[in-house]
Amino acid sequence: MKSVQEQMAIIRRGAVEILVESELEAKLKKSVETGVPLKVKAGFDPTAPDLHVGHTVLIQKLKQFQDLGHEVNFLIGDFTGMIGDPTGKNETRKALTREEVLKNAETYKQQVFKILDPERTKVVFNSSWMGQMSAADLIGLAGRYTVARMLERDDFHKRFSGQQPIAIHEFLYPLVQGYDSVALKADVELGGTDQKFNLLVGRELQKQEGQVPQCVLTMPLLEGLDGVNKMSKSLGNYIGITEPAKEVFGKVMSISDELMLRYYELLSDVDLAQLQLVRDGVEGKAGGAHPMESKKSLARELVARFYDQAAALRAEEEFVQQFKQKEVPDDIPEVLIDAGEPVWICRLLTDAGLTASNGEARRLVKQGAVKLGGEKIADAGLEVAPAGELILQAGKRRFARIKFLEKK
């Protein structure tokens, strides 16, 4: 096992805040002396079926703890998922059914093991203990926190001040998340910066239970491909970990050098010395790694993580062919459209699978990122005449061959 100082250097990497750092050092010191690993926890509510790399910031930090020899608890919030996390929301979130939550949870398990070692990961569901609670137990838990304390949360405070409704069950969410730490006797809990309040509730509940309070480590919310907004499927600025290898590679290659450095810090396994070479290259210092080569290395690393090394090399070869030689890929999907009335360009993009929604399609057109037959489309209201065959392109990497079928 590495020394406390060596472990802290790895743990600090990319972290926004460690509460309380001296307590974590003491926990690590005891772990080194006794050989007993720390219990490290991170919770994920299965509110959607697929993860993107923004979610993997926490999973990657869990992997670092795992590689340091600690016990990793990947907590699936199947109980909290049915409440709906109110964090950052300006309105009450729609709760999912148990069937939806369990279906999403199954895909989460498959996807996280692209990063975590399944043999050394404990997957736990918080319904295991919350589902056993009686109404009296739940009311007792609710009695441990006041409404005034809950309103210290920025999102609740804004909604209350703006006379927007807050449902009673939303106050239960941070208490249930906090109680998860009591049930697991967690030594460390990881979460995004937006989860800080909930993580500290866990510390407080552990103190009330007579447990040694967990240390809290917050990680930043990863910016999406635009480098501005939080990575989100609804904004179309995401890299999905189940996307085709060539898509993952191409999207990484599209980001700015500054954003690449951020992705290295939060997503990569490279050691601190190599990370410094990447940083020096981005800052233009002598001896630094060339940003283009660094970007390729990062793209290969992520593709290999989600697929394998062979897929990473194939994706790189295709990228070089497609973008260095400005070629349209050979294996683009073919989409058959019945010839008839003209088709709205945004609907065409969505039907072709190039965008997730008409809203995303409209944004891409406005950004000048859509081409039809090699010509840039500037009008989001364009009606495409159904004739022959056309190459439709969204962004730098997404193509479809549109074939209009003649009506008989």
UniProtKB/Swiss-Prot annotation:
'HIGH' region (motif): residue ranges: 46-55
Protein's organism: Syntrophotalea carbinolica (strain DSM 2380 / NBRC 103641 / GraBd1) (Pelobacter carbinolicus)
Name of the gene encoding the protein in the UniProt record: tyrS
Keyword Protein biosynthesis in record: yes
GO CC terms: cytosol
EC number: 6.1.1.1
Known partners and oligomeric status: Homodimer.
Enzyme class per UniProt: ligase
Name of the protein this chain belongs to: Tyrosine--tRNA ligase
